[in-house]
Amino acid sequence: MIVYKDMITEDEMFTDSHCPRVVADFFYEVDSRFTTVSSNVDGRLIGANPSGEGGEDENVDDTSKRVIDLVHANGFISVPFDQKSYKAHLNLYLKTIIERLQKTDPDKVPLLKSQVNKYMKNVLDNFDQYEFYMGPPSNPDAMIVLMNFREDGMTPYFVFFKDGLT
């Protein structure tokens, strides 16, 4: 299994089990799904027998909630952004990525700038459709992960900077 981590914070962002797709050479798009989680303990796991103990009516779980699996599994934290503050963060983050690429693969930098500008123009044109997340330590220098929905309106997908991952 390949684990993709934020290059700055070392936070686990996703694994190859999520089937990442490379988009515009410099991004991964990762589909996710909604799931229901509960904080209740299933009594059957500790040997309880609800039907034998008269508890068959206790199947109602009012502590369950619907979550996006990638957000829940990795402890992503929702981050509020307006367009201006997101652009400011993006510029600082890209500076970090470009500095890293200058050392490892300088020929890639012009293409990165070009592709990121094209992709991010689309993001900024549709800014209100995106949600923003970061890993649990809330490091202000960390990658901000974008989340939107596929055309079906039900499938959440996340956008990661490929060169921001290790």
From Swiss-Prot:
SUPFAM superfamilies: Mss4-like (SSF51316). Keywords: Calcium, Cytoplasm. Belongs to the TCTP family. Pfam families: TCTP. It is found in: Cytoplasm. Involved in calcium binding and microtubule stabilization. It comes from the Eukaryota. Residues 1-166 form the TCTP domain. The keyword Iron-sulfur does not apply. PROSITE patterns: TCTP_1 (PS01002), TCTP_3 (PS51797). This is Translationally-controlled tumor protein homolog. InterPro entries: Mss4-like_sf (IPR011057), Mss4/transl-control_tumour (IPR011323), TCTP (IPR034737), Translation_control_tumour_CS (IPR018103), Translational_control_tumour_p (IPR018105). It comes from Schistosoma mansoni. The gene is TCTP. GO terms for cellular component: cytoplasm. GO terms for molecular function: calcium ion binding. The keyword Flavoprotein does not apply.
